[in-house]
């Protein structure tokens, strides 16, 4: 399982690097999905199945959908060429395809050849996570939820302003 851990870690670092350097938001989202899935692979290889499942369901599912909605609300199609035909070019899909293929090969290797092997650790279930989140860290959880909600309201406000001078700097 160490091999799968290192492969997923490498894919996470590379895809996160591409998230940072991409100018186009849609390209960045594709690399972010690969980054989140590779981090879930790291969790699965460490035996933290609950954390890996949460990574896939919450982050790679719900948060990415939220980011897509934000991109749609901001209406950045004038600044960047966001035509669908532009995304079908092979140049766009080479990097994500290679990283996804690396993740797929490492996961199939882990499923078929490393059935009983894992990195030592203990199983964390949802009860332990809930007790820790809403026990001593309840203030931090509530604070982060308020921060995320306020960021969503600000982005919605910026995206829906109609009479904004494009040369005006905020």
Swiss-Prot record:
GO terms for molecular function: NADH dehydrogenase (ubiquinone) activity; quinone binding. Its main location: membrane. The keyword Transmembrane applies. Its EC number is 7.1.1.-. GO terms for cellular component: plasma membrane. It is found in: Cell membrane. It catalyses: a quinone + NADH + 5 H(+)(in) = a quinol + NAD(+) + 4 H(+)(out). It is a multi-pass membrane protein. Pfam families: Oxidored_q3. Keywords: Cell membrane, Membrane, NAD, Quinone, Translocase, Transmembrane, Transmembrane helix. NDH-1 shuttles electrons from NADH, via FMN and iron-sulfur (Fe-S) centers, to quinones in the respiratory chain. Couples the redox reaction to proton translocation (for every two electrons transferred, four hydrogen ions are translocated across the cytoplasmic membrane), and thus conserves the redox energy in a proton gradient. Composed of 13 different subunits. Subunits NuoA, H, J, K, L, M, N constitute the membrane sector of the complex. Belongs to the complex I subunit 6 family. This is NADH-quinone oxidoreductase subunit J. The gene is nuoJ.
